[in-house]
Swiss-Prot record:
The keyword Nucleotide-binding does not apply. This is Small ribosomal subunit protein bS6. Binds together with bS18 to 16S ribosomal RNA. It comes from Chlorobium luteolum (strain DSM 273 / BCRC 81028 / 2530). One of its GO terms (cellular component) is cytoplasm. GO terms for molecular function: small ribosomal subunit rRNA binding; structural constituent of ribosome.
Amino acid sequence: METNKLYECTVIIDGGLQDEAIAAAMEMVQKVITEKGGSISSVLDIGRRKTAYPIKKKTIGSYAHIEFTAATPVIAEIERVLRYEEVLLRYLIVHLTSPLLEMRKRVEKYSVVIGSPEDNVASETDAADKVAK
């Protein structure tokens, strides 16, 4: 029997759809994963963003990120179903290996929350005043 591995799936849903249609598309993606034998561990709805380039003549997409565990043969079945969904502009399923997970932990550990541009200007002004004294 095949062991389950950790995967992440990022989808871009047509941003021109109503919020209800986008939510229905997200439910559909989650349903496909669970029906094919996957177990979802987290769902992150990133929201509407401008795409870097037009995809199927669309420039706005609603991004979502799903982490799940599944057996390797199941991934091909999930991709086969997602490939023909018209509301999905793009999808990508990636196997999360140990080096990727370790890198993610390091990034989370050392990441710094950057404030607003006004905060940065104020801190630079304060630093300049301290140097001048």
